[in-house]
Amino acid sequence: MQAPERLRQQQFALAKHIRDPEANLPPPDIEDRRLAIYRELFFNNVEGLLAGNFPVIREILDDDIWLDLVRAFYREHLCQTHLFPEVPREFIRFLETRIEQGEQDPAWLMELAHYEWVELALDLAENDEAENDANIVGDSILDTAFSLSSLAWPLGYQWPVHRLSPGFLPENPPSEPTFLLVRRDRDYKVHFEEISALIFRLLQLISDAPELTARQQLT
């Protein structure tokens, strides 16, 4: 066996052991004390990254539940990127998979995770330079076609995600959904605003058909 291939297999064995030491034996001839350092270092890096990006979830969940969730993500999820800013999005994909598998996570967990991720996603989003100002036609604003900025996201949730906290965790979602407009201003600050169902629907219509005038959108 050539040395590069042998090294590659050793690296894979080490990586599998670090991710799931209970199911994968370590490479031979490596002292467990040294392996323990790597196991703790790698896991703590991932846990710290997720805790920093999902602070409300981290605050709500008990330590054991949170660490078990992170451990499952660390052990089971195959990330599609090596970029650290994309790891929170991978965590959301992991939660989606858990829903499909019937895992008994809190009912609000997926939506709260998405809500917390949005701030990072919008903070890193690139502005669409091709966007134009409103195309004013005639003297009436109703005859103007508007387009929605790529840095303004209308979002709808079953749960009041902007209010969830250790002191406010309803057993069931309210009868009315929560609608939010999340936007990034020119100073790169992200803002969250609660909006009505009517405004949410109007923003959806503008996003779906920016070529239509306001008058056409309302008819």
What are these regions (language model features)?
Residues 202, 211-219:
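Short acidic, hydrophobic short linear motifs in intrinsically disordered regions
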Residues 1-126:
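N-terminal, charged low-complexity regulatory/assembly segments
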Residues 75-201:
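Hydrophobic packing positions characteristic
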Residues 208:
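Glycine-rich, acidic and aromatic/proline-enriched surface loops and short helix-turn segments
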